[in-house]
Amino acid sequence: MAPVLPVVLPLQPRIRLAQGIWLLSWLLALVGGLTLLCSGHLLVQLGHLGTFLAPSCSFPALPQTALAAGTVALGTGLGGAGASRASLDAAQYPPWRGVLTPLLAVGTAAGGGLLTLALGLALALPVSLNQGLEEGLEAALAHYKDTEVPGRCQAKRLMDELQLRYHCCGRHGYKDWFGVQWVSNRYLDPSDQDVVDRIQSNVEGLYLIDGVPFSCCNPHSPRPCLQSQLSDPYAHPLFDPRQPNLNLWAQGCHEVLLEHLQGLSGTLGSILAVTLLLQILVLLGLRYLQTALEGLGGVIDGEGEAQGYLFPGGLKDILKTAWLQGGLAHKPAPEEAPPDEEPPKEVLAEA
């Protein structure tokens, strides 16, 4: 059987190959560690912002997959660096001969598969992030008033912290607060006619006002923050509703969070692409180095040329050999076949 993609490797190219693999392996370990840091950072960010994502959003799968892929890449890089360094010394290489095959198998199957999957998620999942933030922020605004409802007691605090930290207001702007009841019922006087009129003015029976929570206010504004009657042009003589309100955060939280998370996922995707490229180069180099040294008995400075290859034969030949070996393993040879047992003498006598 002819080997797949054979390469003739004299002495000096073998040494340069081992040295190059050593350098690439350390780069892979470095980038793998960077992948761990970036995916861990994104996972922590999603832990803080998970309240504002819809439960059906699958975006958190990206940092989880990237975390596993970075771990395998880091291990592959460290293993490749150790194996390539040991290959330069005939006394140190024998212990690594039994490690290289499992390392190549795990690096190809687990590392390559996880990196490819994580890179695909980095390209595909940011599209679903838009809808996930839409639904999550809509629910967050609707539950802002539920400070005494079990399971939603922290909704107000989390939304206020989000708007203050990311300098945003509402979902797409401060007017989003006009369409939801954000004042808790415990602060409403049912005997107040204005409260009754506002509740009866909509079919949902909500207390709707043209105001915003305090967390929408920009503390750097030189003027006092205007929070109520924002749609009434006569309520605030110095405020024109048709002009940008410098007292309130101009951007909506959807736009800010989408840009923030897509930026993190884009950075992680770029690192994953570099990691996948280095993983392929290291695994290919290790495979050629392994097969070349096997032909020399594990001695890199052995006399003569060595041939490195990916597979000892084509895919068809490999499958055929495996099939034949599997069939022969279950079929005993003629000389090993057990002799036919003779029937008991009692049975012969009765016959």
From Swiss-Prot:
TM regions (residue ranges): 20-44, 65-84, 103-125, 264-286
Superkingdom: Eukaryota
GO cellular component terms listed in the entry, alphabetical order: photoreceptor outer segment; photoreceptor outer segment membrane
Biological-process GO terms, alphabetical: camera-type eye photoreceptor cell differentiation; cell adhesion; detection of light stimulus involved in visual perception; photoreceptor cell outer segment organization; protein heterooligomerization; protein homooligomerization; protein localization to photoreceptor outer segment; regulation of gene expression
Compartments in which it is found: Photoreceptor inner segment membrane; Photoreceptor outer segment membrane
Record bears the keyword Ribosomal protein: no
Membrane topology annotation: Multi-pass membrane protein
Keywords, alphabetical: Cell adhesion, Cell projection, Disulfide bond, Membrane, Sensory transduction, Transmembrane, Transmembrane helix, Vision
GO molecular function terms attached to this record: protein homodimerization activity
UniProt cross-references to CDD domains, sorted A to Z: peripherin_like_LEL
Deleted gene: phenotype: Knockout mice are viable, fertile and grossly phenotypically normal. 50% reduction in maximal rod photoreceptor response at 9 months of age. Progressive thinning of the retinal outer nuclear layer becomes evident at 1 month of age. Evidence of rod photoreceptor degeneration, shortened rod outer segment (ROS) length, increased ROS disk diameter, and progressive disorganization of the ROS at 1 month of age, leading to near-complete loss of organization by 2 months of age, however organization returns to near normal levels by 4 months of age. Rod photoreceptors progressively die by apoptosis.
Protein name: Rod outer segment membrane protein 1
Species annotation: Mus musculus
Gene: Rom1
